[in-house]
UniProtKB/Swiss-Prot annotation:
This is 3-hydroxyacyl-[acyl-carrier-protein] dehydratase FabZ. Belongs to the thioester dehydratase family. FabZ subfamily. SUPFAM superfamilies: Thioesterase/thiol ester dehydrase-isomerase (SSF54637). The gene is fabZ. GO terms for biological process: fatty acid biosynthetic process; lipid A biosynthetic process. GO terms for molecular function: (3R)-hydroxyacyl-[acyl-carrier-protein] dehydratase activity. InterPro entries: FabA_FabZ, FabZ, HotDog_dom_sf. It is found in: Cytoplasm. HAMAP family: FabZ. Its EC number is 4.2.1.59.
Length: 149
């Protein structure tokens, strides 16, 4: 399954400047998702991080991976209607084993790859990795829960 940004906005509540997934390129319900974000110098975060040496913040990479995980969780809800999904939200529960291996700069394309470690009911545990040009730049274990708004 492929989702463009308009379709992603139908799934996630996030909007500019905090929608951090531009496209989903691969999705296997209940097990795997891959997508990307194009990092642009025109993003507001670069006004302060850092004006003379722009580096995309690691917390934004984590959030982008989490948003991709949210798409995976929502799209894996087979028996839910669009209306039911619209009344749900994904809450972060924990971030473990986070590592930042290389800086991300304007012009990079961040590729998110997430595998499900465990899913029990509304709780999802994900192995999340982010790449630029096939090089691992960040990774973490993410845990989240789908709840009613």
């Amino acid at each position: 399954m492929v989702f463009n940004v308009v379709e992603i906005q139908k799934i996630l509540p996030h909007r500019y400047p905090f929608l951090l997934v531009d496209r989903i390129t691969h999705l296997e319900k209940g097990s795997y998702i891959e997508g990307y974000k194009n990092v642009s110098i025109s993003e507001p975060v670069f006004q302060g991080h850092f004006p003379d040496h722009p580096i995309y913040p690691g917390v934004m990479i984590i959030e982008g991976m989490a948003q991709a995980g949210g798409v995976l969780a929502f799209e894996s809800m087979d028996n839910a209607t669009q209306e039911e999904i619209a009344n749900k939200v994904v809450y972060f529960m924990s971030i473990d084993k986070a590592k930042f291996r290389s800086p991300v700069t304007p012009g990079d394309q961040l590729v998110y790859k997430l595998n499900v470690i465990k899913n029990k009911g509304a709780i999802w545990q994900l192995d999340a990795k982010a790449y630029v040009d096939d090089k691992l730049v960040a990774e973490a274990e993410l845990k989240a829960m789908i709840v009613d708004k």
